[in-house]
Amino acid sequence: MIRIFIDADACPVRDETYRVAQRHGLQTFVVSNRMIAIPSSPLIERIVVTQGMDVADDWIAEQVNAHDIVISADIPLAARCVARGACVLDPRGRILDEDAIGMALAMRNLMEDLRATGAITQGGRGFTRADRSTFLSALDTAVVRGRKRAAQAR
Protein backbone atom coordinates (compact mmCIF):
# COMPACT_ATOMS: atom_id res chain seq x y z
CA MET A 1 0.00 0.00 0.00
CA ILE A 2 1.33 3.41 -0.88
CA ARG A 3 1.66 6.09 1.77
CA ILE A 4 2.01 9.86 1.72
CA PHE A 5 4.73 11.77 3.58
CA ILE A 6 4.41 15.54 3.98
CA ASP A 7 7.49 17.66 4.70
CA ALA A 8 5.13 19.86 6.67
CA ASP A 9 6.99 22.78 8.25
CA ALA A 10 6.47 25.18 5.33
CA CYS A 11 4.05 23.19 3.18
CA PRO A 12 1.18 25.31 1.76
CA VAL A 13 -0.83 22.29 0.53
CA ARG A 14 -1.30 20.23 3.70
CA ASP A 15 -5.10 20.62 3.68
CA GLU A 16 -5.33 19.58 0.03
CA THR A 17 -3.15 16.56 0.74
CA TYR A 18 -5.34 15.53 3.68
CA ARG A 19 -8.44 15.61 1.45
CA VAL A 20 -6.83 13.49 -1.27
CA ALA A 21 -5.45 11.04 1.30
CA GLN A 22 -8.88 10.63 2.90
CA ARG A 23 -10.57 10.14 -0.47
CA HIS A 24 -8.09 7.41 -1.46
CA GLY A 25 -7.76 5.88 2.03
CA LEU A 26 -4.01 6.47 2.25
CA GLN A 27 -1.92 6.52 5.43
CA THR A 28 -0.36 9.98 5.69
CA PHE A 29 2.56 11.13 7.83
CA VAL A 30 2.79 14.84 8.61
CA VAL A 31 6.44 15.35 9.54
CA SER A 32 7.69 18.56 11.16
CA ASN A 33 9.89 19.88 13.93
CA ARG A 34 6.96 21.65 15.62
CA MET A 35 3.36 20.87 16.48
CA ILE A 36 1.09 21.26 13.46
CA ALA A 37 -2.67 20.87 13.62
CA ILE A 38 -3.94 17.85 11.70
CA PRO A 39 -7.44 16.51 11.11
CA SER A 40 -8.71 13.85 13.46
CA SER A 41 -8.36 10.74 11.32
CA PRO A 42 -6.89 7.28 11.80
CA LEU A 43 -5.21 7.76 8.40
CA ILE A 44 -3.29 10.91 9.33
CA GLU A 45 -0.40 10.73 11.79
CA ARG A 46 1.64 13.66 13.11
CA ILE A 47 5.37 13.03 13.52
CA VAL A 48 7.20 15.74 15.48
CA VAL A 49 10.97 15.32 15.24
CA THR A 50 13.60 17.06 17.34
CA GLN A 51 14.83 20.50 16.34
CA GLY A 52 17.81 20.50 14.04
CA MET A 53 18.94 20.86 10.47
CA ASP A 54 17.36 18.24 8.20
CA VAL A 55 15.98 16.07 11.05
CA ALA A 56 12.51 15.93 9.45
CA ASP A 57 14.09 15.28 6.05
CA ASP A 58 16.16 12.44 7.48
CA TRP A 59 13.08 10.85 9.08
CA ILE A 60 11.16 10.97 5.80
CA ALA A 61 14.08 9.66 3.71
CA GLU A 62 14.59 6.75 6.11
CA GLN A 63 10.91 5.75 6.21
CA VAL A 64 9.85 6.16 2.59
CA ASN A 65 9.54 3.11 0.33
CA ALA A 66 9.09 2.52 -3.37
CA HIS A 67 5.74 3.79 -4.65
CA ASP A 68 5.19 6.13 -1.66
CA ILE A 69 4.44 9.79 -2.34
CA VAL A 70 6.41 12.63 -0.74
CA ILE A 71 5.21 16.24 -0.69
CA SER A 72 8.18 18.60 -0.39
CA ALA A 73 9.80 21.64 -1.96
CA ASP A 74 13.19 20.47 -0.64
CA ILE A 75 15.15 19.30 -3.68
CA PRO A 76 17.91 17.40 -1.79
CA LEU A 77 15.20 15.53 0.17
CA ALA A 78 13.40 14.83 -3.10
CA ALA A 79 16.58 13.33 -4.56
CA ARG A 80 16.98 11.02 -1.56
CA CYS A 81 13.35 9.87 -1.80
CA VAL A 82 13.47 9.35 -5.58
CA ALA A 83 16.57 7.19 -5.06
CA ARG A 84 14.40 4.95 -2.85
CA GLY A 85 11.71 4.67 -5.54
CA ALA A 86 9.24 7.24 -4.21
CA CYS A 87 7.34 9.80 -6.25
CA VAL A 88 7.93 13.38 -5.06
CA LEU A 89 5.64 16.33 -5.71
CA ASP A 90 6.48 19.91 -4.92
CA PRO A 91 3.65 22.16 -3.66
CA ARG A 92 3.14 23.58 -7.15
CA GLY A 93 2.42 20.10 -8.53
CA ARG A 94 5.74 19.50 -10.26
CA ILE A 95 6.54 15.79 -10.25
CA LEU A 96 10.14 15.09 -9.32
CA ASP A 97 11.03 11.60 -10.52
CA GLU A 98 14.12 9.87 -11.91
CA ASP A 99 13.82 11.88 -15.12
CA ALA A 100 13.42 15.30 -13.49
CA ILE A 101 15.48 15.19 -10.29
CA GLY A 102 18.89 15.74 -11.90
CA MET A 103 17.79 18.96 -13.58
CA ALA A 104 16.01 20.11 -10.42
CA LEU A 105 19.20 19.62 -8.37
CA ALA A 106 21.28 21.47 -10.96
CA MET A 107 18.83 24.41 -11.02
CA ARG A 108 18.72 24.54 -7.23
CA ASN A 109 22.50 24.67 -7.03
CA LEU A 110 22.71 27.33 -9.75
CA MET A 111 20.09 29.52 -8.05
CA GLU A 112 21.84 29.10 -4.70
CA ASP A 113 25.12 30.25 -6.27
CA LEU A 114 23.44 33.23 -7.96
CA ARG A 115 21.84 34.29 -4.67
CA ALA A 116 25.18 33.94 -2.86
CA THR A 117 26.87 36.26 -5.37
CA GLY A 118 24.05 38.80 -5.17
CA ALA A 119 23.03 38.30 -8.80
CA ILE A 120 19.53 37.41 -7.60
CA THR A 121 18.08 39.32 -4.68
CA GLN A 122 14.38 38.53 -4.97
CA GLY A 123 12.50 35.45 -3.85
CA GLY A 124 10.32 33.32 -6.08
CA ARG A 125 6.81 34.18 -7.18
CA GLY A 126 3.93 33.87 -4.74
CA PHE A 127 1.81 30.75 -4.36
CA THR A 128 -1.42 31.03 -6.38
CA ARG A 129 -4.81 29.38 -6.63
CA ALA A 130 -3.69 27.90 -9.96
CA ASP A 131 -0.68 26.33 -8.21
CA ARG A 132 -3.05 24.74 -5.69
CA SER A 133 -5.22 23.34 -8.50
CA THR A 134 -2.20 22.00 -10.38
CA PHE A 135 -0.98 20.33 -7.19
CA LEU A 136 -4.33 18.60 -6.59
CA SER A 137 -4.39 17.22 -10.12
CA ALA A 138 -0.76 16.04 -9.89
CA LEU A 139 -1.38 14.37 -6.52
CA ASP A 140 -4.39 12.46 -7.84
CA THR A 141 -2.29 11.36 -10.83
CA ALA A 142 0.57 10.29 -8.55
CA VAL A 143 -1.80 8.20 -6.41
CA VAL A 144 -3.22 6.40 -9.44
CA ARG A 145 0.26 5.77 -10.89
CA GLY A 146 1.62 4.65 -7.53
CA ARG A 147 -1.16 2.13 -7.09
CA LYS A 148 -0.63 0.72 -10.59
CA ARG A 149 3.13 0.40 -10.07
CA ALA A 150 2.71 -1.17 -6.64
CA ALA A 151 0.24 -3.71 -8.08
CA GLN A 152 2.63 -4.55 -10.94
CA ALA A 153 5.51 -5.03 -8.49
CA ARG A 154 3.65 -7.74 -6.56
From Swiss-Prot:
Disulfide bonds: none annotated. Pfam families: DUF188. Belongs to the UPF0178 family. This is UPF0178 protein GDI0551/Gdia_1457. It comes from Gluconacetobacter diazotrophicus (strain ATCC 49037 / DSM 5601 / CCUG 37298 / CIP 103539 / LMG 7603 / PAl5). The lineage of its organism: Bacteria, Pseudomonadati, Pseudomonadota, Alphaproteobacteria, Acetobacterales.
